[in-house]
Design a protein with these regions (language model features):
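Short, charged, surface-exposed hinge/linker loops at domain edges
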Residues: 1-5, 36-72
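Structural detector for hydrophobic anchor residues on beta-strands
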Residues: 4, 17, 27-29
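Short aromatic-glycine-(Arg/Gly/Cys) micro-motifs in beta-strand/loop hairpins
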Residues: 9-21
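Intrinsically disordered, low-complexity segments enriched in proline/serine/threonine
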Residues: 14, 24-27, 62
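Hydrophobic residues in beta-strands and at strand termini
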Residues: 21, 31, 70-72
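Intrinsically disordered/low-complexity terminal segments and short unstructured peptides
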Residues: 2-4, 13, 32
Length: 72
């Protein structure tokens, strides 16, 4: 079993939680609740990784998130 990091935002326009798994092309989804989002992320991640079965080492490697401060 392997653990992946998901970036999650709440979209006030659609009232949905949106999640992206960095480094896995196509691994993004949405849900009405955080629980639904987690279920959907797990499902889409499994589907994406099935596509890369033999070439998982060729996938980009997620390094981390950075906070960027700017004056606005």
């Amino acid at each position: 079993m392997r653990t992946y990091t998901a970036y999650v935002e709440f979209d006030p326009e659609t009232k949905l939680y949106v999640g992206v798994v960095p480094g896995i092309p196509g691994a993004h989804t949405q849900g009405v609740t955080l629980d639904e989002l987690q279920k959907n992320l797990k499902e889409v991640l499994e589907l994406c990784l099935e596509e890369y079965q033999g070439a998982k080492e060729d996938l980009p490697r997620f390094v981390g998130l950075q906070l960027i401060e700017i004056a606005v």
